[in-house]
Amino acid sequence: MKAKAAVFMGAHKDFEVREFDVTECPAGYGQMELIASGICGTDIHFHNGTLVVGAPTVIGHEFVGRIIGLDEKEAEKYGLKKGDNVIADIAVPCGECILCKNGDDANCVNMQVTNGGSIDVAPYLYGGYAQVNYTPLSNLIKIPEDIDPVVAATFACPGPTTIHACSLAEKAGVNLSEINVAVVQGLGPVGTFAVMYLKRMGVKKVYAVTAGDNAKREELAVTLGADKVFNLTREGKDNITRALQAENGGLGVDLCFEASGAPQAVVQGMDILRNRGVYLIPGQYSASGGIEIQPQMITFKALHIIGSSQYSMKDVEAYLDFLGKNPELSPVIEKLGSKYKVEQINEAVADAKSGNNIKTLLVR
């Protein structure tokens, strides 16, 4: 049996579609056939050269598949069996560092990953851009039977990313249900999920700030819960800043969630927050350059700035729980993924970069 995979050849280079032997499942691993695998913004950063990963390799960390091979006795320890639909989580924290012991394993200082292994050593296919994937059983999260696996795949990384950032806010004493006004900067996959999540966590008013000409994203944000979408290109930064500073009787907004990845967004975020406002920043993930900020504003406004990177398996579980508790979202989410075969990888990456797709998925 053979399986195709899209091999990452390096920044700015075309992916190569290659065939690999489907080998026996190693001990401790699950063997999955592809249902859907997302192209993440992180993968785009790899291809653009703003984040570095070795090549050649099979990248991709948003793999959702159906288990076709495992050691059944060993799998019982994880509540898994053949035929289960699962999300493959790539993070392997050490469990021993101070962060892991404090429950912050998403930021383990010795973090390893399950994907990106050698394509020259069996079983070859550890990454998500493949028709078959091998992931340790300990890193597989079962998708409940009442959740469409393609729906689960659509926000398999953006969802846990958002939830983890919000959990850090909650850990710092922020009660989302008591937030009056929140602003989401950026309407990519993370920002889009953040809109629906914040609204359903009880935030009274959720605004989004975006740029460019993409009415589809703006309409979707409103459908998912945004009370209003501001567009920097049409309305101008200064006008939007003034409008948001007027919230809460002229105090500004309570919470800002940065998901644009644009460094200049941080300046506006600090400007629109009220005194003691909370700024969640999971979006600044690539080396996009520096900007000038006014540190005095952090002090005088007593801003609470919380960076967030990565997520843990418990955030993936919380994501699936969120989908299960909000089934009305599924009919909307299932329409958001633009689907491509693995053989169409270069077209898929180009379309993902264009911004025209809400979410780009590889399917079998």
Question: Which residues does each predicted region cover?
Answer:
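Short amphipathic alpha-helix with an adjacent loop that forms part of the alpha/beta core around
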Residues: 237-249
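Glycine-rich beta-strand-centered segment in the early N-terminal region that forms part
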Residues: 21-37, 50-101, 106, 144-146
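Short SAM/SAH-binding signature in class I
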Residues: 251-257
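NAD(P)H dinucleotide-binding glycine-rich loop of Rossmann-like/cofactor-binding domains
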Residues: 94-185
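Short Gly/Pro-enriched turn/cap motifs at secondary-structure boundaries
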Residues: 21-22, 54-60, 120-125, 131-132, ...
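C-terminal hydrophobic helical "lid"/dimerization subdomain
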Residues: 1-3, 239, 267-271, 313-364
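Mid-domain Rossmann-like dinucleotide-binding core that forms the NAD(H)/NADP(H) cofactor-binding site
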Residues: 145-235, 242
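Glycine-rich phosphate-binding loop and adjacent beta-alpha segment
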Residues: 203, 222, 227, 263-326, ...
